Amino acid sequence: MSLLDSLVRTARRRSPWLFHLNAGSCNGCDIELVACLTPRYDVEQLGIRLEASPRHADIIVVSGPVTRTTLEALQTVYAQVPDPKVVVALGSCPASCNMFAGSPTVVGPLDRIIPVDVYVPGCPPRPDAIVAGIADAVAILCGDVPRPEPTHVPVVADACATGGLS
Amino acid sequence: MDAESILHMLDVESAAEHRTDGWWVDVPDLDVRGLATLMRTREVRFVTLTGTPDTAGGYRLIYHWDADGALLNIATTVSAGCIASIADIWPAADWVERELRDYYALVFEGRAETPTLMLLEGDEPGLFSRTSAAGREIDPAVTARDAAEAERKES
Amino acid sequence: MSPVITMGPFHPALEEPYKIDVVCEGEHVTDASIRVGFNFRAIEWLAERKNYTADIALFEHVCGICSNVHTLCLSRAIETLAGIEVPERAQYIRVVVAEAERLHSHLLWAGIACELIGFETLFMACFGLREKIMDVLEAISGNRVNYAMNRPGGVNRDIADPGAVLAAVRAIADATSKQLIPVLTTDATVRARCAGVGVLTRADAIAYGAVGPTARASGLPQDIRASAPYEAYDRLLFEVPVRQEGDVFARVVVRALEILESCRIIEQAIEQMPAGPFRGDDYPKVPAGEVCSRIEGPRGEVFYYVASDGSDTPTRVRVRTPTFANMPTARPMVLGQTFADVPLIQASLDPCYSCTDR
Amino acid sequence: MTVVRGLISLLVFPGALFALPAGWFMMWLQRKINARAQGRIGPPFFQPFFDFVKLLAKEPVVRPRLQGFLMTVLPLAAVASTLGAIALLPVFPKAGGFSGDLVLLVSLIEVGPLCAVLGGFVSRSLYGGIGASREAVLTLAYNVPFLIALFALVASAGSFSLAGVALAAAWPVRVLALIALVACIPVKLHLNPFSAASAEQEIYAGSTTEYDGPRLALWELAHALEWVALTGLVASLAFPVADAAWPVRVVVFVAVSVALVVVLSFAAASTARLKLAQTARWFLLCGSGIALSALVVAFVRL
């Protein structure tokens, strides 16, 4: 591995910027993610920053079971984040739809819409679990750990958009 | 103004019932706009409007009011699927009426437009009515989208 | 042709997805419309298909910030229908948890509001303080969010260490009155951003059906805890802070004072809490009927309507969350204000869109 | 000889070789102070450097050719002009060499914000556009006191040359003018309370909203260099002793710059963000007031 390569890997490991996207979550996960920024957890120590624009991000953190109404925005944001990028499913909702499974307005789980790399289980996960999940995502981002095989082939937008309502 | 005087003014005192959670009264041929205007002038707070399907195929609408802290529930029946809107008298009722259209395709007459609130623009109203048969047996592993896809494959 | 600026559905000012279309002349707002529904998970629809036990867990997830008010309100509705009494100790425990939740919610809100006016240091201070009450909630319930405390007929867990709760609450009251309130009310930059901004008149507050701190900051002294006391509130002394101005600053002040009142309530409740059982033996059987239930959540009045046909599944559960009532008031508030104020004004309502959409 | 000196000041000190690490250090220091003021630990020492490298290594988003070109050239121009401005700083006023005048320095410093305004517009994002127009309004507002203060220095020194200004301006004028100049720095660096142009909570990341990967890295670089240029401008004007040895000059230059970073960071950490109109009003009234008084003193002395 060349010197430049290892420099880039180190930089990716030490500077993960997040974009957080709420796809119909109950706020539980979202507020715990915000708590990660605050003095007790202070993820800025690890170089983690919550970015306002998806163009600046390396890691997309998605919470919520993905509702029909957030679907389009979710796909737009996913396309807007430049490569290399990693998707973190925050909490139980994006993993399984949790208790919202069966709802006519929920089109998740998340892995049917975009490929998911890291799952952070919990309802909601504690801030330390979130930080650990981001660390897993960073390992994928900088190439220390291979990207997992996608669990589902993401489906096209139209099939989702009409889900349950047609 | 307190709940009993309001009931007296509406002339439904005898039919009203006082329970632990407030006053309840059924008025089948309720003049909702008259009621709304009265409540507005007496500063009785509009709490919300509940719609629920009744056994006869119509809908039961309950107007909830807060009169000096006491809850006043005035119910009426909608059989033809439409009722007068009170959103112009009570801006507070605007969102509820839009929501009820989304859920049960109820029509509120007198509104210039009833945009969707919870559904996407252009969706057909009446989500709850349309899907009332679905999902009684929920398998957590199967989402509604899977069901829709399976249906599409079958047909 | 005035430009329409759409904020959202994913916007850094908003923890949650929602859209606000703002029509601007330069930096001045001439019209605004709010679009919600991004968090619409059809919880009311799901509730008609799950039994009461599952519904309690389901409604806990209406909102992750004020989860306790939803289970409390639903539990109270079921108790009223079934005609059962809650043991006295459980009533006090419910009050403690509800007020602790109000504390964390108000501190959270104060933090987010500071973040919105770019005052990051105060945001961090609020969240640092909030961690104290999160520790209390975690010690009581085992969870930081979604406490799963309420069940029909009582609460699921006892308060094991009331002394620790008292100590934490006193520390919060102290920090609030000595640090938070002085900074919030005297800092020149905070005042410049909040005073006179986003006024909601008393008449508008009534017409739009505003509830909670939003209504109280516009001169309406409404609070379900005082007007229709539930649980142990009729045995506790507290005041309902009311302001007449109706601007963002008034809403800041009302919530700051409520933090102190909540601390007072918790202190009294812990001291008065009697010994005894904290829940009934069995889950109640719910007879046919309909019932309304109201409690005062951190954001205002929470309203539940439950209809039952006597089976173990409700036929209809209707939820009117405080933000659903408050959110339409944002329109009269932002008219004539500058674009930079819009995020702050909507945040001053302490909006919760996952509550609104359900 | 002058060419060699010019190249040294452009590439070595106070130019690229010094300015790059110094800029990153100042960005880190600001974030660290901010974090400490908030009771946090804050970012590690090499954070801005790693941020930069990581952004450079990202795959750029494919854009239409002209837009992509502009979005690369504008931040590059900002970097180049700011670097040029740094090279002109009169750290060694007596050394001669390529001694530009104040007008050149100011125009080079102004190219950065101008590029940011243009960059916001060409990115074709609504928020980029709003950020850019705010940036433009603020540029106008703070330039009033900024230019008046510099003019007061020129008037007092009777010279447009940087070295002349650094050496000859009278003390009362200098102090007032420097206060006005320092007050302008937070606007350029998007620091509280004058950070309306990059108000994340209103307009995402302002004019850089649409920039990604290497293009964003260039903006970050320009931002780091602006730190050095602006604090350096004040530092070099604040130490006019002509016959100090060069190591002393360097040490004082660096020390004053860092002290300024500390002061500005603390000010930013303890304030909220003012709105655009409030910021503009502040500069047109208070900022200009201070600068004008400097000018008055300068003329009275004459």
Annotate each PLM feature:
Chain B
Residues M1-S155:
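Terminal low-complexity/charged segments
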